């Protein structure tokens, strides 16, 4: 094993030094947060959070573990186990989406914003991705969604917040939302 490989070392970091991921599209406070809080109170944190260093070198940006961090804050836990990754903005976006997209009960608005973030990040990578084929297919792969489904969610992400909320609350169908977003 390579002794220089610090990528997967687990370190304890102060919760106060960790800021949320910019434009994180997933809701953190939900009914599942209580279950998570109880689990952490009983068993501790089973999976380390994933962070990257902030540009100013003072603190960290959270990539995966927003709900775990929130649960720890509510429990008064001051330090959390973390893995520090070296990632550019695009790769950080991709990892953040992939870490969250497989959760149950994701709202259509969350999935739409997440897919758009990942799609834009992959597109931004450009040449490296072209060899791998259709960007939309790549975006949906982790969650088992087709490229066509990803494109529909991507379009939905342009819907105004009020109507997007209607889709989340099932007052407006997903298909209607996609059509309205395309107008």
Task: For the regions a language model picked out, list residue spans one by one.
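Short, charged/polar connector segments at secondary-structure boundaries
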Residues: 1-85, 92-102
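Basic, low-complexity intrinsically disordered segments
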Residues: 170
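Amphipathic, charge-rich alpha-helical segments that serve as recognition/docking helices
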Residues: 25-27, 34, 70-158, 165, ...
């Amino acid at each position: 094993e390579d002794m220089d490989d610090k990528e997967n070392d687990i370190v304890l970091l102060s919760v106060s030094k960790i800021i949320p991921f910019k434009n994180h599209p997933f809701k953190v406070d939900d009914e599942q947060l209580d279950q998570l809080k109880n689990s952490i109170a009983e068993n501790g944190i089973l999976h380390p959070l994933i962070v990257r260093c902030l540009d100013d070198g003072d603190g960290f940006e959270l990539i995966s573990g927003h709900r775990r961090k929130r649960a720890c804050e509510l429990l008064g836990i001051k330090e959390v186990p973390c893995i520090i990754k070296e990632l550019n903005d695009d790769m950080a976006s991709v990892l953040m989406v992939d870490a969250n997209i497989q959760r149950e009960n994701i709202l259509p608005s969350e999935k739409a914003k997440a897919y758009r973030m990942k799609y834009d990040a992959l597109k931004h990578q450009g040449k490296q991705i072209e060899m791998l084929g259709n960007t939309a297919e790549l975006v949906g792969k982790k969650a088992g969604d087709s490229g066509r489904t990803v494109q529909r969610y991507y379009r939905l992400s342009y819907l105004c917040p009020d109507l997007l909320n209607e889709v989340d609350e099932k007052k407006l169908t997903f298909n209607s939302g996609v059509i309205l977003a395309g107008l």
